[in-house]
UniProtKB/Swiss-Prot annotation:
Upper taxonomic lineage: Eukaryota, Metazoa, Chordata, Craniata, Vertebrata
Name of the protein in question: Glutathione synthetase
InterPro entries, per database record: Glutathione_synthase, Glutathione_synthase_a-hlx, Glutathione_synthase_C_euk, Glutathione_synthase_N_euk, GSH-S_sub-bd_sf, GSH_synth_subst-bd, PreATP-grasp_dom_sf
Alphabetized CDD domains for the sequence: eu-GS
Co-factor binding details: Binds 1 Mg(2+) ion per subunit.
Function according to Swiss-Prot or TrEMBL: Catalyzes the production of glutathione from gamma-glutamylcysteine and glycine in an ATP-dependent manner. Glutathione (gamma-glutamylcysteinylglycine, GSH) is the most abundant intracellular thiol in living aerobic cells and is required for numerous processes including the protection of cells against oxidative damage, amino acid transport, the detoxification of foreign compounds, the maintenance of protein sulfhydryl groups in a reduced state and acts as a cofactor for a number of enzymes. Participates in ophthalmate biosynthesis in hepatocytes.
Keywords carried by this UniProt record: Acetylation, ATP-binding, Glutathione biosynthesis, Ligase, Magnesium, Metal-binding, Nucleotide-binding, Phosphoprotein
Modified residues (Phosphoserine): S415
Reaction catalysis annotation: gamma-L-glutamyl-L-cysteine + glycine + ATP = glutathione + ADP + phosphate + H(+); gamma-L-glutamyl-(2S)-2-aminobutanoate + glycine + ATP = ophthalmate + ADP + phosphate + H(+)
The organism's place on the tree of life at top rank: Eukaryota
Enzyme class: ligase
EC number: 6.3.2.3
Matching SUPFAM superfamilies: Glutathione synthetase ATP-binding domain-like, PreATP-grasp domain
Binding annotation for substrate: 125, 148-151, 214-216, 220, 267-270, 450, 461-462
Length: 474
C-alpha cells in the first residue's frame, strides 16, 4: 500500500517546517482538545494529535465499509428490539460483570413498566482494521461497533482541510484532491434533528449528557452547532444535574429545569466510572421517559462485546435479517473470529487455543473507551487466572487482526514530530431513526481514521494512544 510519502519522511528539516504549518492549520480549522491539565476549561486549548500525512487505505475496503454500514444499522436496531435474545446472550455475562448487570437491570425495569418512547435514534460507529492476508491482499475486519457516545465525528469533519493544506504546500495538488470530503457531525446532527422533529414538540430541547471534565468538547460542540443552525437548542447537563432538576410528568414526558426534552444524547455513561448511585438513578429516570434516548438502554446493550460474539454464530444473522441473504453476506464478510468464554467445553477449547498461540488472539472485556483489551503474555496470565472461574464469562476472545504497517509522522502537543511504523483503524458513522416499527432513516454519514504506532496494542485518541488521520485511497 505505498503512497509515495517515503522520500518526504526522510527529510528532517522539511518535516519540521511542514509540521509547524500543519499544526497552525489544525488550530485554525478547529482540530482542538482541551488540555489534560485543565479539562473543564477552554481558556487554554491545544491541537488534537494527528498525522502529518494522510494514510493509505485500499479504496475497495473503504467502499466495502461504507456499503455495509446500513446493514449494521439494521442489525443493531433489530437486536435492540429482541429482549429474549439480549437476556439469553447476556445471562452469563451479567452474573460476573456488575456494570453490564446494572444496565440490564434498568432494561428490565423499563420493559416491565412499558417502553414510553416511540421514536428511536441510533448514532453508531463501526470500527475496522485491514487484515493483511498471506498473499499480500488486505481484508476488512470489524473490531467493534460503538452504539453509545461514538466520538470524533466533529473533529473528523475538520482534518481533511489540514491534510489538503500539507499536500498543497508540497505542490502535490493532485494528491490533495484525492482526500475525501467528510462531515460526520452534519450527518449525526441530521439524525438527532429527525428524531426531534418526530417527537413533535416545537419548543422541546435536546439534552446532551456530558462529563464536567471533557477534553473532547469541541467534537461535541460541532454537533451542537449543527443543531442550532436548524434552530434546535441543546442544553448540556451532567447526570448529577438530572438527579437534582430532572422530572417526569404523568405522561412520562421528561423535563429539565422546567424545559421539555425531546432527545437525550449521551456523551457519558459508557464506563463504570461514569456512574455513582445517584447517576444510576438519573439514568433510570431518563430511560423511563418518552424522550428519544441516543442510545436507549437496549441499544447500548446491543453494542456489547458479548452480543458481537453471539452474532457471529452460524444462523444468528439470518434470524435477525430474514430474507436478506445479501446483507447477511456483507456483514459476515467483515467478521473476525469471535469466541465465547462461557463455562463449558466451547469456552475451554477457546482458552486452550489462546494460551497455545497468544499472538493470534485478543482478550476483550465488556468495556468501551479504549485501553481495556489484553494481549500476549498479559492475556495468557489473565486466562490462566480465569480459566476455572465464572468470571471468564465477562470476556470474549477475538482473533487478532494483523494489518500491514506503514510509515507516517505523528504530531502530538509537546512532543517532537515522530516518523514511525503505524497501523490504522477505520470507523464508519451510521445513523438510523425508527418511529414505532417504521424505519424513517438509515444511512452512513462519514468516516474516521485513527492511526497509532505499532508498539501500542490498544487504545484510541481519547485514551492518548492513537491520533486523527484521513484515508488516502490507494
Amino acid at each position: 500500500m505505498a503512497t509515495g510519502w517515503g522520500s518526504l519522511l526522510q527529510d528532517e528539516q522539511q518535516l519540521e517546517e511542514l509540521a509547524r504549518q500543519a499544526v497552525d492549520r489544525a488550530l485554525a480549522e478547529g482540530v482542538l482538545l482541551r488540555t489534560s491539565q485543565a479539562p473543564s476549561s477552554s481558556h487554554v486549548v491545544s491541537y488534537a494529535p494527528f498525522t502529518l500525512f494522510p494514510s493509505p487505505v485500499p479504496s475497495a475496503l473503504l467502499e466495502q465499509a461504507y456499503a455495509v454500514q446500513a446493514d449494521f444499522n439494521l442489525l443493531v436496531d433489530a437486536v435492540s428490539q429482541n429482549a429474549v435474545f439480549l437476556e439469553q446472550t447476556l445471562s452469563s455475562t451479567i452474573k460476573r460483570d456488575s456494570f453490564t448487570a446494572r444496565l440490564f437491570d434498568i432494561h428490565k425495569q423499563v420493559l416491565k413498566e412499558g417502553i414510553a418512547q416511540t421514536v428511536f435514534l441510533g448514532l453508531n460507529r463501526s470500527d475496522y482494521m485491514f487484515q493483511c492476508n498471506p498473499d499480500g491482499s488486505a481484508a476488512l475486519k470489524q473490531i467493534e461497533i460503538n452504539t453509545v457516545s461514538a466520538s470524533f465525528g466533529g473533529l473528523a469533519s475538520r482534518t481533511p482541510a489540514v491534510h489538503r493544506h500539507v499536500l498543497s504546500v508540497l505542490g502535490k495538488t493532485k494528491e490533495a484532491a484525492k482526500i475525501l470530503s467528510n462531515n460526520p457531525s452534519k450527518g449525526l446532527a441530521m439524525g438527532i434533528a429527525k428524531a426531534w422533529e418526530l417527537y413533535g414538540s416545537a419548543n422541546a430541547q435536546v439534552l446532551l449528557i456530558a462529563q464536567e471534565k471533557e477534553r473532547n468538547i469541541f467534537d461535541q460542540r460541532a454537533i451542537e452547532n449543527e443543531l442550532l443552525a436548524r434552530n434546535i437548542h441543546v442544553i448540556r447537563r451532567k447526570f448529577e444535574d438530572v438527579s437534582e432538576k430532572g422530572s417526569l410528568d404523568q405522561d412520562r414526558r421528561l423535563f429539565m429545569d422546567g424545559q421539555e426534552i425531546a432527545v437525550v444524547y449521551f456523551r457519558d455513561g459508557y464506563m463504570p466510572g461514569h456512574y455513582s448511585l445517584q447517576n444510576w438513578e438519573a439514568r433510570l429516570l431518563l430511560e423511563r421517559s418518552c424522550a428519544v434516548k441516543c442510545p436507549d438502554i437496549a441499544t447500548q446493550l446491543a453494542g456489547t462485546k458479548k452480543v458481537q460474539q453471539e452474532l457471529s454464530r452460524v444462523g444468528v444473522l439470518e434470524s435477525f435479517l430474514p430474507g436478506q441473504p445479501e446483507a447477511v453476506a456483507r456483514l459476515r464478510a467483515t467478521f473476525a473470529g469471535l469466541y465465547s468464554l462461557d463455562l463449558g467445553e466451547e469456552g475451554d477449547q477457546a482458552i486452550t487455543k489462546a494460551i497455545a498461540a497468544p499472538s493470534c488472539f485478543v482478550l476483550k472485556p465488556q468495556r468501551e473507551g479504549g485501553g481495556n483489551n489484553l494481549y500476549g503474555e498479559e492475556m495468557v496470565q489473565a486466562l490462566e487466572r480465569l480459566k476455572d472461574s465464572e468470571e471468564r464469562a465477562s470476556y470474549i476472545l477475538m482473533e487478532k487482526i494483523e494489518p500491514e504497517p506503514f510509515r507516517n509522522c505523528l504530531l502530538r502537543p509537546g512532543s517532537p514530530a515522530r516518523v514511525i511504523q503505524c497501523i490504522s483503524e477505520l470507523g464508519i458513522f451510521g445513523v438510523y431513526v425508527r418511529e414505532g416499527k417504521t424505519l424513517v432513516m438509515n444511512k452512513h454519514v462519514g468516516h474516521l481514521l485513527r492511526t497509532k504506532a505499532i508498539e501500542h496494542a490498544d487504545g484510541g485518541v481519547a485514551a492518548g494512544v492513537a491520533v486523527l488521520d484521513n484515508p488516502y485511497p490507494v
